[in-house]
């Protein structure tokens, strides 16, 4: 009889304790974020969708050097080089297959002109796989992106628009190395 009362008291105590724990957790604020209504905070170095940026002058930054396609471990980037009348290279077509992309950022690191940049945009869900193949028109933005003052042709010292080195806008004259000798 005593053991039956003891088991009943212990059973009631465990039920009351369980109800107390459930009710205390039910009144706490939720840890779950309701995704579409509440935007997800992304870390500062998050690597999302790839874009192609422009120079401060408004030209495409991409010079079709093909380094991004070589650096890509899954081979989702393809492009074809063409040349303008002034001698500047540009991609005739630039294609990224985001269904194969692993968003590693190696293409951004390999790009010498900072044309390829990663954005914090990650909402790229599609029902048709072909819709995840982005062409140059979809990737090209109107601004310079993360690096607003960088102009590849100004930094490399290449002649622009049939002007000799040092004659372009905001460009210093070439340095004669022999004049620096003692």
From Swiss-Prot:
Xref: NCBIfam families: NuoI (TIGR01971), PRK05888.1-1 (NF004536)
Source organism (scientific name): Psychrobacter cryohalolentis (strain ATCC BAA-1226 / DSM 17306 / VKM B-2378 / K5)
InterPro entries the record matches: 4Fe4S_Fe-S-bd (IPR017896), 4Fe4S_Fe_S_CS (IPR017900), NADH_quinone_OxRdtase_chainI (IPR010226)
Family: Belongs to the complex I 23 kDa subunit family.
Note accompanying the cofactor annotation: Binds 2 [4Fe-4S] clusters per subunit.
Protein name as it appears in the record: NADH-quinone oxidoreductase subunit I
An annotated GO cellular component: plasma membrane
EC number: 7.1.1.-
Gene: nuoI
Keyword Iron-sulfur recorded: yes
């Amino acid at each position: 009889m005593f053991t039956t009362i003891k088991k009943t008291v212990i059973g009631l105590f465990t039920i009351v304790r369980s109800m107390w724990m459930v009710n205390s957790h039910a009144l706490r604020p939720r840890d779950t974020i309701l995704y579409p209504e509440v935007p997800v905070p992304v870390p500062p170095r998050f690597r999302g969708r790839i874009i192609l940026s422009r120079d401060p002058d408004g030209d495409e930054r991409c010079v079709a050097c093909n380094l991004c396609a070589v650096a890509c471990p899954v081979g989702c980037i393809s492009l074809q080089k063409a040349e303008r009348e002034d001698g500047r290279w540009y991609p005739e077509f630039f294609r990224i297959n985001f269904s194969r992309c692993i968003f590693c950022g190696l293409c951004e690191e390999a790009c010498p002109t900072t044309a390829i940049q990663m954005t914090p945009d990650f909402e790229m869900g599609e029902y048709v796989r072909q819709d995840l193949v982005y062409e140059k028109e979809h990737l090209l933005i109107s601004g310079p992106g993360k690096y607003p003052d960088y102009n590849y042709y100004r930094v490399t010292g290449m002649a622009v628009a049939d002007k000799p080195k040092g004659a372009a806008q905001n460009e210093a004259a070439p340095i004669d190395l022999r004049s620096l000798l003692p």
